[in-house]
Amino acid sequence: MNFDIPEFLPALPEIAVLGMGCVLLLAVAYGGGQSGKIAYWITQLTLVIAALLTFYFLDYSSQSVTFNGSYIKDSLSDTLKLFIYIIVFAVFLYSRDYLQARALDKGEFYVLGLFGVLGMMVIASAHHFLTLYLGLELLSLSQYAMVALLRNNRWASEAAMKYFVLGALASGMLLYGMSMIYGATGDLHVAAVAEGIGGSGSSQVLVFGVVFIVVGLAFKFGAVPFHMWLPDVYHGAPTAVTLYIGTAPKIAAFALLMRLLVEALGDVQAHWQDMLIILSVLSMAIGNVVAIAQTNLKRMLAYSTIAHVGFLLLGILTGTGVGYAAAMFYVIVYALMSLGSFGMIIFLSRSNFEADRLEDFKGLNERSPWFAFMMLILMFSLAGVPPTVGFYAKWAVIMAIIDKELLWLAVVAVLFSVIGAFYYLRVIKFMYFDSPTEEISLSKRADFRWCMSANGLAMLGLGIFPGALMGLCVAVLG
């Protein structure tokens, strides 16, 4: 391979994040008592630098493939990376006070989070199966360690162990599927695999490889019946870690799905479409029904995530540009909604108190009317109530599957959306119709309050004016 300077330019954001990650490691090691504060500012600066570099080299009219075909810079990768930077920036901002109150502000959270971002970036730009796998493992290993940050907490240790064991199982299935694809096509480059399948058609080995890849992806997404790790991890992990896991990595998982199923295995859509239909219906059914019985808000949002994964898969299984664009719109919007929802749990939390029970939101309207209104917008958006952006996201996906003449699937999606609205409205009932159980004032940094307000209002603004974001998704995938 000819390592000339232009070949490294498309990967400059990844190189910058890797370099700053090494600087961050040194800063944490030698920062002493100020290591947490230093790590926070270095991490946020790194995300800003990466965003500026990505934006500077942004070009929707062309794409470049480098590193011997294992890395691609295209409109999909650049767009997803920009949203990853924005969301992770907000995650670190929301988490700062939470970590300080629990003596977790030592720098490890930011180091692991930044290397997780690097893993997401690699996934978004991967053009080779092994590059995809390496990016996925970098992200996964960072998340396993983050879940176990509270070493002396039984719930966190149990969640980390479950996450690690089941994550390793999913990675093994994904890798085994990739090896079977290699056996069937003789290559692991995304474009070469697609070309090989188009030239020779499907074989039994190829179909088995597709099955293992879909199962591995379902594990990583938390789709039913491979969802058993997700509620325990969301509940057991510190809320700051749950906030991280439940937002930006979903965008990276969407990129993984697009690179593997759509770009590499698009010609065998007939084999994976039926599997995605089953995963989607089961996820919407189990996710929405089980969420109704939850009294812990983090567990409720975990089952809500499973239901939203089902909706996301609906867009992918259409096999059309409109469906892919709707799915991309949905995953970005979901990440923003999840960001605000877990951010509100952190907003109510304080030292030695996790505001993760539904009862903790009782009477929030009396204690803080503005942030009760923000939570109302977020819950309405997750439920898909107009005029929030959650309604438009679901409508776009449903229209895409109707265009594909899968009318029965659209009816199922609408039915489970109506069922799912119940548990979101229950949170609103606690905030507005119940009396507060305590009168403790809610105080957070000004930057937290401004960011949370922007997060909530964005759900309303994007719902009223969805054209810009949807136009971007259509330009990338439609």
Curated annotation (Swiss-Prot):
EC category: translocase
Span-the-membrane segments of this chain are 8-28, 38-58, 75-95, 109-129, 130-150, 164-184, 206-226, 238-258, 275-295, 306-326, 328-348, 371-391, 405-425, 457-477
Q: Where in the cell is it found?
A: Cell inner membrane
- What are the entry keywords? Cell inner membrane, Cell membrane, Membrane, NAD, Quinone, Translocase, Transmembrane, Transmembrane helix, Transport, Ubiquinone
**InterPro entries in the record:** NADH-Q_OxRdtase_suN/2, ND/Mrp_TM
Enumerate the catalysed reactions. a quinone + NADH + 5 H(+)(in) = a quinol + NAD(+) + 4 H(+)(out)
UniProt membrane topology term: Multi-pass membrane protein
Pfam families found in the cross-reference section: Proton_antipo_M (PF00361)
Any GO BP annotation: ATP synthesis coupled electron transport
Instruction: List the EC numbers from the record.
Output: 7.1.1.-
| Molecular-function annotations in GO | NADH dehydrogenase (ubiquinone) activity; NADH:ubiquinone reductase (non-electrogenic) activity; quinone binding
Q: Does the keyword DNA damage apply?
A: no
Cite a GO CC annotation: plasma membrane
Family of this protein: Belongs to the complex I subunit 2 family.
What quaternary structure, including any partners, is listed in this protein's UniProt entry?
NDH-1 is composed of 14 different subunits. Subunits NuoA, H, J, K, L, M, N constitute the membrane sector of the complex.
Q: What does this protein do?
A: NDH-1 shuttles electrons from NADH, via FMN and iron-sulfur (Fe-S) centers, to quinones in the respiratory chain. The immediate electron acceptor for the enzyme in this species is believed to be ubiquinone. Couples the redox reaction to proton translocation (for every two electrons transferred, four hydrogen ions are translocated across the cytoplasmic membrane), and thus conserves the redox energy in a proton gradient.
Protein name, entry field: NADH-quinone oxidoreductase subunit N 2
The taxonomy runs: Bacteria, Pseudomonadati, Pseudomonadota, Gammaproteobacteria, Chromatiales
